[in-house]
Design a protein with these regions (language model features):
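Non-catalytic cap/lid and distal C-terminal segments of serine-dependent acyl enzymes
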Residues: 11-303
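C-terminal motif of bacterial Sec signal peptides marking the signal peptidase cleavage site
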Residues: 2-4
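Bacterial signal peptide processing site
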Residues: 6-9
Length: 303
């Protein structure tokens, strides 16, 4: 949420240092970068939030890579005039001593390519050859770039961020989080790159694919996760959903996925799993803003 303190800054390639201030954030600073993605053949807009005191510190910070970065901080610039209010929520958690102080890397999405960019491509091999027209329409196979997007984060964006910011590069300090299709990409990225991401936060995950009750996509994700989900005891997973609007369709698929995750050793007792049902929560940024403290505390909570 934009407010009176902190700043947003802007930079073009190449980058000698962090870009200067542009706008204000309620706490901390937001720096804007434009990073060329050879994997996707695009230039990707990146917003990096650094906490209060970052410039005067020599410490290294855990980092969360978040999808739909354009919706994280400033409701005045989003399509629906809502944001996750990440700067405000994190500022409160830090002030209350609830979390280790992080850096947030927000990866902007582009509406026309978002679905294809966040699609868990390798899960699609589990789809049946004969499937409904609705499933094929959902897949929109002419624009699938999920593998390229994930590779961009790991092979281009992360090295760049590690060089520009004082981040802890280790797996156990590097997390990925998003909602809806971003929830799918988060668990996918952790599964494809288990050596890079130590945990994933998945809010309102779009397990269902289509809206017609066809389970083909959900079944494919289940089969993919059964094979690829890390099960070494060193990874953690947060899963939630609301109960209204689009989220009202997610319950059965989410419960099935939670059962699978538990069968692979994730559990609350071990501190490797947290789940939540947001009664009345909708499929929108205001609902995610109201409960994002939960995955933040799970990912960053002080031990």
């Amino acid at each position: 949420m934009m407010g009176a303190c902190g700043a947003v800054s802007d930079e073009k390639e190449p980058v000698p240092s962090n870009p200067p201030a542009l706008q204000t954030a309620s706490t901390g600073n937001v720096h804007r970068h434009y990073i060329i993605s050879p994997q996707m053949g695009d230039t990707v807009t990146i917003d990096v939030w650094t906490p209060e005191g970052y410039d005067g510190s020599s410490r290294r910070y855990p980092v969360i890579y978040m999808h739909d970065g354009q919706n994280l901080f400033d409701a005045t610039t989003t399509w629906n005039h809502q944001s996750w209010e990440m700067d405000s929520v994190i500022g409160t958690l830090i002030a209350d001593g609830k979390i280790s102080v992080p850096v947030i890397v927000g990866i902007h999405s582009v509406a026309k390519s978002r679905k294809g960019d966040l699609m868990p491509e390798n899960a699609l091999k589990y789809l049946p050859e004969k499937r409904s027209e609705a499933v094929d329409e959902f897949l929109d196979t002419t624009s699938l770039r999920g593998n390229a997007y994930a590779a961009f984060i790991v092979n281009t964006l992360k090295p760049r961020m590690d060089a520009l910011y004082r981040l802890s590069p280790e797996r156990d300090s590097t997390f990925v989080m998003g909602s809806s299709m971003g929830g799918l990409m988060s668990i996918y990225a952790m599964s494809e790159y288990p050596e890079t991401f130590g945990a994933a936060g998945c809010l309102s995950t779009h397990w269902i694919g289509t809206l017609d009750g066809n389970n083909a996509f959900s079944d494919a994700m289940y089969a993919y996760m059964d094979e690829k989900l890390p099960r070494d005891g060193h990874h953690r997973l947060y899963l939630d959903h609301g109960t209204t609007t689009l989220d009202s369709l997610y319950g059965p698929s989410e419960e099935r996925m939670i059962g699978l995750v538990r069968s692979h050793g994730y559990s609350e007792e071990r501190g490797t799993l947290e789940t939540f049902v947001d009664e009345g929560g909708a499929h929108q940024e205001s609902s995610w803003a109201a409960r994002v403290w939960r995955p933040l505390q799970f990912l960053l909570g002080k031990k």
